[in-house]
């Protein structure tokens, strides 16, 4: 998976959370993570490295785990 594809999935998760009426902070976290990932200068192998993910502003531990899983398996 490319980082663009992963960012699109994170945006889709944010939209689905909004439709479900979830916590606005959680929705914003996914949307911000998607934007941060789109502008991230690294390549796909870096998305499987927890240290590299931790350096991306706007990506917390929980979302970093989801990104790592998506990069490794192409599914959640």
What are these regions (language model features)?
Residues 1-76:
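Long, highly charged, low-complexity intrinsically disordered interaction regions
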């Amino acid at each position: 998976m490319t980082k663009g594809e992963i960012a699109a999935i994170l945006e889709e998760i944010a939209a689905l959370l909004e439709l479900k009426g979830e916590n606005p902070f959680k929705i914003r976290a996914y949307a911000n993570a998607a934007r941060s990932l789109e502008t991230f200068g690294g390549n796909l192998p870096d998305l499987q490295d927890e240290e590299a993910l931790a350096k991306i502003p706007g990506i917390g531990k929980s979302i970093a785990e989801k990104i790592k899983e998506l990069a490794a398996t192409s599914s959640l």
